[in-house]
Amino acid sequence: MRDKTLFIVVLAVMLLVTACADTAIDRRALVMRNNPHVTKIDSLHSLTVGNGRFAFTADATGLQTFPEYYKEGLSLGTYSEWGWHSFPNKEDYKIVETLQDHPLPGHPHGIYAVQFPEGPERNAKAAEWFRANPHRLHLGNIGFDSLAVSDITEIDQTLDMWKGELHSHFLWRKLPVTVTTSCNGDSDIVSASVSSSAKLAVGIRFPYPTGEAADDATCWTADDCHSTDIILSEPQRALIR
């Protein structure tokens, strides 16, 4: 009787496995039903498009219109694998100045980089410089100009994770605005299509990095530390370096 019961259980498992193997997964439906949907401006509700090497994080407008509002939550940013920056090493710090002997079981002479919270001062500053450098560079902020959070209503935003497109619809001063944001799959390019009867302008800002450990990596008061040049300016395009 026991052998018969065991045979029935094994047979049932085999039939279940066979049935599952014959049932194809609708991958698109699986992904699409988990698309994030945003209906209000919230500093924790930013969404990102990218290609694995380049990423553009947007707010409820589909662009980076309110970076200050989102800075304490999921901050808005544009980052890449290749965009890095280092502050000048004016004091000529050496990596050896950050090392300290920390014996551990099995490793009596373990040498590790530490922060030196109690000094010496030069070692602490060396450790801080190497902690902060190099760091990823925020490549630029792209957003609508002169919009206030209070002017944005009836937000309906969805990230299509299957296509990699961010679809945003909202009212600005009761005028409808539709924005589609996407990133090129092969090149580090972000694009946005804006449809509206409202007279909207788009601005581009380039921040200087901060080097801090936990902020939105943007300093807007260091204009003397970097510059931006307009190489080409035409009615429908511009080349900025």
Name every feature range the model reports, one short phrase each.
Residues L6-A12:
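Sec-dependent N-terminal signal peptides
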Residues D3-K4, L16-D26:
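Bacterial Sec-dependent signal peptides at the C-terminal "C-region" and cleavage site
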Residues T23-R241:
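Beta-sandwich/jelly-roll carbohydrate-recognition scaffolds of carbohydrate-active enzymes
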